[in-house]
């Protein structure tokens, strides 16, 4: 695909990170299936702006949140971000879902990988996210414990001094 070949154009601009996160959570609050899952944004995250492709950031976060909603039947899903070394923003979607077995975590970003054949989807979402994140100069990963939940994360370059 164009994304995997690095042939996709990025439309860069200044992005108010907390505002973007609030917008994404508001959108997903309307898509939530039941009230047993709380969807929230961690408001303790710092007020920053980044030079990024807003739509691509939303695309990755939306994929993470869609997956979290599929696999979390009760508890919470939290969108947060942190500054790392004043040069990276680390976005994270943490859920209290069923988690991913250790032996399957390394495969999850491969194309056509679906860990649950009963769940709708082609198994391309995380592979596309990985390509987009790499194209934007970041890294992507997951930290998960089976039966406890997962944290899907990605990093994006940050230039210090761009606080709001």
What are these regions (language model features)?
Residues 100-112, 152:
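Short conserved segment of the HATPase_c
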Residues 68-69:
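Short helix-loop "hinge" at the ATP-lid/N-box region of the Bergerat-fold HATPase_c
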Residues 11-26, 58:
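A conserved beta-strand-to-alpha-helix junction within the catalytic ATP-binding
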Residues 1-12:
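Helix-loop junction within the histidine kinase core
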Residues 11-16, 33, 38-48:
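Conserved catalytic submotifs in the C-terminal HATPase_c
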Residues 125, 129:
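Short alpha-helical Gxxx[C/S/T] motif in the catalytic ATP-binding
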């Amino acid at each position: 695909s164009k994304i995997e070949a690095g042939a996709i154009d990025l439309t860069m601009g200044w992005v108010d990170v907390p505002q973007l996160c609030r917008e994404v959570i508001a959108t997903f609050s309307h898509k939530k299936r039941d009230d047993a899952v709380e969807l929230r944004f961690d408001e303790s995250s710092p007020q920053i702006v980044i030079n990024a492709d807003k739509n691509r950031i939303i695309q990755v976060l939306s994929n993470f949140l869609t997956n979290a909603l599929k696999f979390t039947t009760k508890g919470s899903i939290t969108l947060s971000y942190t500054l790392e070394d004043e040069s990276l923003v680390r976005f994270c979607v943490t859920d209290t879902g069923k988690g991913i077995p250790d032996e399957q975590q390394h495969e999850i970003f491969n194309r056509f990988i679906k860990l649950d054949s009963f769940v709708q989807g082609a198994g391309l979402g995380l592979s596309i996210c990985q390509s987009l994140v790499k194209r934007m100069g970041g890294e992507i990963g997951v930290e998960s414990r089976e039966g406890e939940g997962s944290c899907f994360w990605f990093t994006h370059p940050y230039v210090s001094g761009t606080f709001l």
